[in-house]
């Protein structure tokens, strides 16, 4: 064990640049189309992309979602057909059938490789068909899984209104009563924060949005808007002087765009995952807004008290993150605080600047809990990781879906990493849900092994 | 460009990988960007595979793209050669990487010199063929490669087995009830005194491909995958094949008779032996072992008379099902269709005379529209038609891929052979309302659909919900809303809160474990 799990004093970063698996970044359409209720997502790619959305994510067109594939065929690839005309034809059809407030074009690896000029075509087509078109390059050449959301949000930053603009996002107002909108928006921007606006970015289900808003409201801080908003026509005002803070660790491009294009002030905080993270996140925002946190410590303590039954199950247990959704550092930090030992944090991409506060918090947590620092392995090699898992025999491996069954068959308890992407894990209120997920395989396998007495379900050893 | 929401058959590389990962000790390398490697997820999840899927993605990222991918691909191949020591490494691009127009054959040649295992490039056009065509092509390519290799090495096993024997070609991973069908076919063939020489690709070893010619003939249960291989073996080694799918009592009998003819032809030289005759076996199985023939005659099924159904699926299953329903069950088929557009002529010919119309399309919306128009009493289709049926309140039996986790039952559910006829009869029976039920429904005016009045445990009503609280409650998905409401009210009562706000709701949630 010591060979691969040395006691480190500082965080160790490695980059294996291996062959690893994550879901394609175009998966973000699966949650973003639900989040932005008046949107339509058009993924411009091949049959491979379409089959992925249909299969791996299990999202069929069952609910007639507001997304579709623009499937590139041989004629498109060999440039025998005119991209602009083809996209116009499809977008007109979408406009007629669904009439969305915005069409988001999701570029893929294929549009990158054939160098389709989506950014060039969008403004032309937008003015021609009179629907805003946002272009995001959620391709697997540059990004992994959840970073797809990052590309979409970064693209949307440019569509957020500025304070001096009376109109809402470009052209989206045509059928909305502007007066009532102004009335609605009006009071939001004065009141309690005194001219300091706070916009949070990251896509979360509306109930979690409410919870985090309430959490800040308790500290007398009013959230003036979220990116993305529930409706495209309600995108928040972004201007210089607006404070922005992220809720997800994979949004580094969005953060950079907010700072560069809108001169917003980024609040760099740990992410509001787990009671410890949520408290640190709220505290950081409070400090920027010059507020003394009220009852926060007590609130955190109460949440921890409520988690005690789960904590008893995880204390002293070890966990191995193979790396998938870029939530790994925050989750690892929370689990270490819960008393777990983290052997390895695999992560597809590590932006040390955007995650700086989270990394420092991880380091502090390790010191506080007196456990060794985990290795952070960027772009891990899944084959090597399996060898390490074999050697370390962690109590739990958090893995992609392709590795879960084979590991279970070899007696390693696993949890799908994607579940943390889709479950509600942010804020004080949902801390329990994280532990519910983490402990499920432990509870289940405990009860099975107790009565059945076998763990290995493959003929030869690993 | 095509606006697409859903597809029946996947992209070509999926077919190639299905074939490669079905063989034992074959490793496939996907030359693809991150995210294109979801095949591993599909196989691991759907087949509940215990072993790691023998497919590795050689990731193409911006870096690799800039430098050229040769180094990366060759390195991945040679590395897997050492780590897994496979007999064969198969390289495939995806739709995406195939447009890079790299000389992948050259990569393969280079890697082959450094590897112990054989290395080949799957030769498939990713924009012209679908999953099934690619699987057919890849299987043929692998078989051809090893037959030719054996020929040059002079160890091709050309001497036929003493007793009749068969190769079953086209059973593979992620197929529709393929494992069950294979077991049933083995049983059927054993009953006929025919031994199984090789089953490929599922569970087969490429080292044994040189033994394929030992069999007397090849059996191709599904025409989507295996036909190309059978034709190659016929042309190259003069091996006869049977491609009649033994599905339903009539086609199973036809299949057995074709086998009989081949055995007798092969056996000609051995004058002293009696000719093979399976008629007694067919008769016995049809009338007494399989329950299907009796079932459709039984009084229970009289109500099937004149019922309308629609059939849609891959060409093998849709054609067979159409014939079974029309000939063996006396059901009227308003429309039979397939998404295997490349096989349209064969399909039309097979179902002609058994249905009112034929629909050849890979556009699921056309199938849905057709179903809505015809309003059949039952549908026999894919998961998509099942979904359409749910929306229209028409029962649907699933008879064909694309596969779904439900198509991997743990119990024995073949569609082929005589046990398959029973399964299909059950499926048909469960898809229609039959017998007395039909009349009772008429008498009582449909099923009792009255809602069960929701039980509420909160008896005292001194609790009020604020408007915001109620709005928040309504955001919670319906199936857990009542539980959350109950828990919140319980919490409120315990804490002497009379007005429930959003804060109360979340405080209640946080307090659950306390």
UniProtKB/Swiss-Prot annotation, chain A:
Keywords: 4Fe-4S, ATP-binding, Chlorophyll biosynthesis, Chloroplast, Iron, Iron-sulfur, Metal-binding, Nucleotide-binding, Oxidoreductase, Photosynthesis, Plastid. It comes from the Eukaryota. Pathway: Porphyrin-containing compound metabolism; chlorophyll biosynthesis (light-independent). One of its GO terms (molecular function) is oxidoreductase activity, acting on the CH-CH group of donors, iron-sulfur protein as acceptor. [4Fe-4S] cluster binds at residues 24, 49, 109. GO terms for biological process: light-independent chlorophyll biosynthetic process; photosynthesis, dark reaction. GO terms for cellular component: chloroplast. Its EC number is 1.3.7.7. Component of the dark-operative protochlorophyllide reductase (DPOR) that uses Mg-ATP and reduced ferredoxin to reduce ring D of protochlorophyllide (Pchlide) to form chlorophyllide a (Chlide). This reaction is light-independent. The NB-protein (ChlN-ChlB) is the catalytic component of the complex. Belongs to the BchN/ChlN family. This is Light-independent protochlorophyllide reductase subunit N. It comes from Pleurastrum terricola (Filamentous green alga). The lineage of its organism: Eukaryota, Viridiplantae, Chlorophyta, core chlorophytes, Chlorophyceae.
UniProtKB/Swiss-Prot annotation, chain B:
Its cofactor is [4Fe-4S] cluster. Keywords: 4Fe-4S, ATP-binding, Chlorophyll biosynthesis, Chloroplast, Iron, Iron-sulfur, Metal-binding, Nucleotide-binding, Oxidoreductase, Photosynthesis, Plastid. Substrate binds at residues 435-436. The keyword Glycoprotein does not apply. Binds 1 [4Fe-4S] cluster per heterodimer. The cluster is bound at the heterodimer interface by residues from both subunits. It is an enzyme of class 1 (oxidoreductase). It catalyses: chlorophyllide a + oxidized 2[4Fe-4S]-[ferredoxin] + 2 ADP + 2 phosphate = protochlorophyllide a + reduced 2[4Fe-4S]-[ferredoxin] + 2 ATP + 2 H2O. GO terms for biological process: light-independent chlorophyll biosynthetic process; photosynthesis, dark reaction. It is found in: Plastid, Chloroplast. [4Fe-4S] cluster binds at residue 36. Signal peptide: none annotated. The active site is at residue 300. InterPro entries: ChlB/BchB/BchZ, LI-POR_suB-like_C, Nase/OxRdtase_comp1, P-CP_red_C, Protochl_reductB, Protochlorophyllide_Rdtase. Its EC number is 1.3.7.7. Pathway: Porphyrin-containing compound metabolism; chlorophyll biosynthesis (light-independent). Its main location: plastid. Component of the dark-operative protochlorophyllide reductase (DPOR) that uses Mg-ATP and reduced ferredoxin to reduce ring D of protochlorophyllide (Pchlide) to form chlorophyllide a (Chlide). This reaction is light-independent. The NB-protein (ChlN-ChlB) is the catalytic component of the complex. Belongs to the ChlB/BchB/BchZ family. NCBIfam families: DPOR_BchB (TIGR01278). Protochlorophyllide reductase is composed of three subunits; ChlL, ChlN and ChlB. Forms a heterotetramer of two ChlB and two ChlN subunits. This is Light-independent protochlorophyllide reductase subunit B. It comes from Pleurastrum terricola. The gene is chlB.
């Amino acid at each position: 064990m010591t060979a691969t799990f040395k006691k480190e004093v500082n965080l160790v970063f490695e980059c294996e640049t291996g062959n690893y698996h994550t879901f394609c970044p175009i998966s973000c359409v699966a949650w973003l189309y639900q989040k932005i209720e008046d949107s339509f997502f058009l993924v411009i790619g091949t049959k491979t992309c379409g089959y992925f959305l249909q299969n791996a994510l299990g999202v069929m067109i069952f609910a007639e979602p507001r997304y579709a594939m623009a499937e590139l065929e041989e004629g498109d690839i060999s440039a025998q057909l005119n991209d602009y005309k083809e996209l116009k034809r499809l977008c007109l059809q979408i406009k007629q059938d669904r009439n969305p407030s915005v069409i988001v074009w999701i570029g893929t690896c294929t549009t990158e490789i054939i160098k389709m000029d989506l950014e060039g075509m969008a403004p032309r087509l937008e003015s021609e068909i009179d629907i805003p078109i946002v272009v995001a390059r959620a391709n697997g050449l540059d990004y992994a899984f959840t970073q797809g959301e990052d590309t979409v949000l970064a693209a949307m930053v440019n569509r957020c209104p500025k304070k001096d603009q009376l109109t809402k996002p470009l052209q989206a107002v045509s059928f909305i009563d502007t007066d009532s909108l102004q009335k609605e928006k009006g009071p939001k921007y004065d009141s309690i924060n005194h001219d300091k606006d706070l916009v949070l970015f990251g896509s979360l289900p509306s109930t979690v949005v409410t919870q985090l808003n309430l959490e800040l409201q308790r500290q007398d801080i009013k959230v003036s808007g979220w990116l993305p908003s529930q409706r495209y026509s309600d995108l928040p005002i972004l201007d210089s002087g607006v404070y922005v803070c992220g809720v997800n660790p994979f949004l580094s491009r969005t953060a950079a765009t907010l700072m560069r294009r809108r001169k917003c002030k980024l609040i760099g905080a740990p992410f509001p995952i787990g009671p410890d993270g949520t408290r640190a996140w709220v505290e950081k925002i409070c400090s920027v807004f010059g507020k003394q946190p009220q009852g926060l410590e007590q609130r955190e303590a109460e949440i921890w008290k409520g988690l005690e039954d789960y904590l008893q199950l995880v204390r002293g247990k070890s966990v191995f993150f193979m790396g998938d959704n870029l939530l790994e550092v925050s989750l690892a930090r929370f689990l270490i605080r819960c008393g777990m030992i983290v052997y390895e944090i695999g992560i597809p991409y590590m932006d040390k600047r955007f995650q700086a506060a989270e990394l420092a918090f991880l380091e502090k947590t390790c010191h506080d809990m007196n456990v060794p620092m985990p290795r952070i392995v960027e772009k891990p090699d899944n084959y090597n990781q399996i060898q390490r898992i074999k050697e370390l025999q962690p109590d739990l491996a958090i893995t992609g879906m392709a590795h879960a069954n084979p590991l279970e068959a070899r007696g390693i308890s696993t949890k799908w990493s994607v579940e943390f992407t889709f479950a509600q894990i942010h804020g004080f209120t949902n801390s329990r849900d994280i532990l519910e997920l983490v402990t499920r395989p432990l509870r289940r396998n405990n009860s099975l092994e107790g009565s059945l007495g076998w763990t290995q379900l493959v003929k030869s050893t690993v | 460009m095509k606006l697409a929401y859903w597809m029946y058959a996947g992209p070509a590389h999926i077919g190639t990988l299905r074939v490669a990962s079905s063989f034992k000790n074959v490793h496939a390398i996907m030359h693809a960007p991150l995210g294109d490697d979801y095949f591993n997820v599909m196989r691991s999840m759907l087949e509940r595979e215990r072993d790691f899927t023998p497919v590795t993605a050689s990731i193409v990222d911006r870096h690799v793209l800039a430098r050229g991918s040769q180094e990366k691909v060759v390195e991945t191949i040679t590395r897997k050669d050492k780590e897994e020591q496979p007999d064969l490494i198969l390289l495939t691009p995806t739709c995406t990487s195939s447009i890079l127009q790299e000389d992948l054959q050259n990569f393969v040649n280079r890697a082959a010199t450094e590897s112990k295992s054989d290395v080949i490039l799957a030769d498939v056009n990713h924009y012209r063929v679908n999953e099934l065509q690619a699987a057919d092509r890849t299987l043929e390519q692998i078989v051809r490669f090893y037959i030719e290799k054996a020929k040059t090495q002079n160890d091709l096993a050309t001497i036929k087995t003493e007793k009749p024997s068969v190769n079953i070609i086209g059973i593979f991973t992620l197929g529709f009830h393929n494992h069950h069908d294979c077991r049933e076919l083995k049983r059927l063939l054993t009953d006929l005194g025919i031994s199984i020489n090789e089953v490929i690709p599922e569970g087969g070893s490429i080292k044994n491909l040189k033994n394929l010619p030992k069999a007397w003939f090849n059996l191709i249960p599904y025409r989507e995958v295996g036909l190309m291989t059978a034709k190659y073996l016929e042309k190259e080694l003069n091996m006869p094949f049977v491609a009649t799918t033994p599905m339903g009592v009539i086609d199973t009998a036809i299949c057995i008779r074709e086998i009989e003819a081949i055995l007798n032809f092969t056996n000609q030289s051995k004058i002293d032996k009696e000719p093979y005759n399976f008629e007694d076996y067919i008769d016995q199985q049809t009338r007494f072992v399989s329950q299907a023939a009796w079932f459709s005659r039984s009084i229970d099924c009289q109500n099937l008379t004149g019922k309308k159904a629609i059939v849609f699926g891959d060409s093998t299953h849709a054609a067979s099902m159409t014939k079974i329903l029309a000939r063996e069950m006396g059901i009227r088929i308003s429309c039979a269709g397939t998404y295997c557009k490349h096989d349209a002529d064969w399909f039309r010919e097979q179902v002609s005379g058994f249905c009112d119309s034929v629909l050849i399309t890979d556009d699921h919306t056309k199938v849905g529209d057709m179903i809505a128009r015809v309003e059949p009493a039952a549908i026999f289709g894919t998961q998509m038609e099942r979904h359409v049926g749910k929306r229209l309140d028409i029962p649907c039996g699933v008879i064909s891929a694309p596969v779904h986790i439900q198509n991997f039952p743990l119990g024995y559910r073949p569609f082929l052979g005589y046990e398959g006829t029973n399964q299909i009869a059950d499926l048909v029976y469960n898809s229609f309302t039959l017998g007395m039920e039909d009349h009772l429904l008429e008498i009582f005016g449909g099923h009792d659909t009255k809602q069960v009045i929701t039980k509420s445990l909160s008896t005292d009503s001194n609790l009020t919900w604020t408007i915001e609280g109620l709005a928040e409650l309504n955001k919670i998905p319906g199936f857990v809303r009542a539980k959350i409401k109950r828990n919140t009210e319980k919490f409120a009562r315990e804490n002497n809160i009379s007005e429930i706000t959003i804060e109360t709701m979340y405080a209640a949630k946080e307090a659950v474990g306390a």
